[in-house]
């Protein structure tokens, strides 16, 4: 990856560089030497700001988790029917994933080998359970088809949303987000992705009117 210039170094750029290195090499496969070279600064400069790479990991996954949990505190996630709140949360999850793509990608790839990773996994489970509770509530209110198994549906919804990190790239043609991979398999703006996920999820879940 491109080495950051020393004269542009800030704690925020260090975190951004660290996230990219963690994603590329894996957290366990990343040393402070790797981070030093990628950031273009000495290891002592890094230690001036953080205790070590695990603190960088915690800051990175905390950023993703704070954004996700923040969705649940927004007004439209708390007011209205369960189905309305669920759709709002799903849409906002996709928006946050795309806006914080590297940070959410890293969050989804932690393995649980360190205290920070185990903490992040526990927080992820807590978030997932709260969204699952919304789906259960929507089913209890009669807004979900009777033939839909709620637990399976929850897993499929999260699977669809989380898979976006594998193909979505914000620097698609003409500044629009696009799919990754050779040949540039088309482009999709952020709003198009959000709308497509919502249509697929709720077109399958909702009862026919």
Label each PLM-derived region with a short phrase.
Residues 66-69, 99, 116-141, 150-155, ...:
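Amphipathic alpha-helical packing segments from all-alpha helical-bundle domains
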């Amino acid at each position: 990856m491109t080495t950051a210039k020393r004269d542009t170094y800030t704690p925020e750029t260090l975190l951004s560089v660290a996230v990219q290195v963690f994603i590329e090499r894996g957290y366990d496969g990343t040393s402070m030497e790797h981070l030093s070279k990628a950031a273009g600064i000495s290891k002592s400069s890094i230690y001036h700001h953080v205790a070590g790479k695990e603190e960088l990991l915690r800051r990175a996954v905390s950023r993703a988790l704070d954004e996700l949990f923040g969705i649940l505190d927004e007004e439209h996630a708390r007011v209205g029917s369960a189905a309305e709140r669920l759709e709002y949360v799903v849409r906002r999850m996709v928006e946050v994933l795309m806006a914080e793509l590297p940070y959410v990608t890293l969050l989804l790839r932690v393995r649980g080998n360190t205290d920070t990773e185990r903490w992040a996994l526990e927080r992820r489970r807590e978030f997932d359970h709260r969204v699952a509770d919304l789906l259960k509530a929507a089913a209890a209110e009669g807004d979900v088809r009777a033939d839909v198994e709620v637990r399976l549906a929850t897993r499929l919804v999260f699977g669809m949303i989380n898979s976006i990190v594998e193909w979505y790239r914000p620097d698609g043609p003409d500044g629009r987000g696009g799919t990754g991979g050779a040949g540039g398999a088309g482009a999709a703006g952020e709003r198009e992705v959000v709308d497509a996920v919502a249509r697929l999820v709720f077109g399958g879940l909702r009862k026919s009117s």
